[in-house]
Amino acid sequence: SPRDTVLSTLPRRRPRSRAGCAPALAAPDSVSDALAAALQAPVVNCGAAQLDAQRLAPYYAAAETMPLWVSASGAGARAQLLRTALQNAGQEGLSPVRYRIADIEAYWSATTPAEQACLELLLTAGFDRYSRDVRRGLTGPHEADPSWQLRPAPFDPVAALQAAGTDGDLARLLETLPPVHSAYARLRTALARYRRLAEQGGWPPLPAGPKLAPGDEHEQVVLLRARLRSEGDLPLFALSFGTRYDAPLATAVENFQHRHGLHADGIVGTRTRAALNVPAAERAAQLRRAMERLRWLPRDFGS
């Protein structure tokens, strides 16, 4: 349709070169001029990114099309605050790719008004999507289970950004967009740990074998001990060696079982072995799903 094929007056830009980036029409004199021109079209094309102008226009309505992040001298302190938040979206269980961080990086050092307008709109689009995702969730509760009646609290990102008038206000807004529950903070800390473990290769699976109980002698005890040390259930300083299933190892198994909702009897049976063999990457994915569910809940558990 014509709506889908309309291009803005902004240029395409390759990440490593500005060659061929002349505007389709006369070059705008300022970032504001370029913004005004871009927002006239349904679709703004910035390199490979296609931005919905109608979605972005409300951010500029109250500001009379004045840029929110970028000036003639380039990206400002507010832009850097947002850039950092988008780069670190993985800490919230979200993907920076979803917020076009690569496109933002490609335009970060833009010098022409048209290219700076692209950076401006990419940042606004990133804020719009990120703020909604981290505040209310990527999906709704009903998509996980139609019977759930959870209703995330209303959130207006345009109003929130307008209220963040100073750099300090914006920093506080970005910090408080995620859930403020202590449970969410614990999940975020755990996610960082399991992401590191996954990046380091995780842990080798425990091969199929017999049930292991305290006092047993078995070659797999060495593997079990290494596995439990990888997650910290067995402290590195624990005096536990050899192929005998000793008391420190039994305590470590019980710790692991308790953390995973298993019967904490210290015996490595079928269910405990299966839990031990869940990869670190899958544990990280489980934490991301738990963080997503917390985003659906009221900001105050008592409300």
Range-by-range predicted roles:
Residues 1-4, 8-23:
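Low-complexity basic/metal-binding stretches
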Residues 21, 25-303:
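Auxiliary tRNA-acceptor-end handling modules of aminoacyl-tRNA synthetases
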